[in-house]
């Protein structure tokens, strides 16, 4: 079995969870890889999003952006969250990465990759089991 753990470099909590899961799976002799999902959209983008996220949590900007996204989704029932739409934008590269590397299971420890995986699942483009922790 080959397992992919998807995280994001937005603080270290998610990466710590990913490492704990990986360590447990390796003890079970399961092939396991951790990937920064945003790096699939580009290393530069990954760095910028990480810096913006860390800045926004310090200034409470993230809380307000999250509330705005939720309000948009609730007000316009057929419109997905802006965050979901953004995460869907790199789902093609994520799908290619999963297929090219032959992963059997995907574990997401962050909302961003979970939303990208959800977009792929909704379109029926990937069949591998996906778990969101």
Report residues per predicted region.
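Active-site and donor-binding regions of nucleotide-sugar-utilizing enzymes
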Residues: 12, 17, 74-133
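Short hydrophobic segments within beta-strands
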Residues: 6-8, 35, 133
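Conserved N-terminal ligand/cofactor-binding loop architecture of enzyme catalytic domains
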Residues: 20-100
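Extreme N-terminal starter segment of soluble prokaryotic enzymes
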Residues: 1-4
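Short histidine/acidic/glycine/proline-rich micro-motifs that form metal-
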Residues: 8-12, 39-41, 103
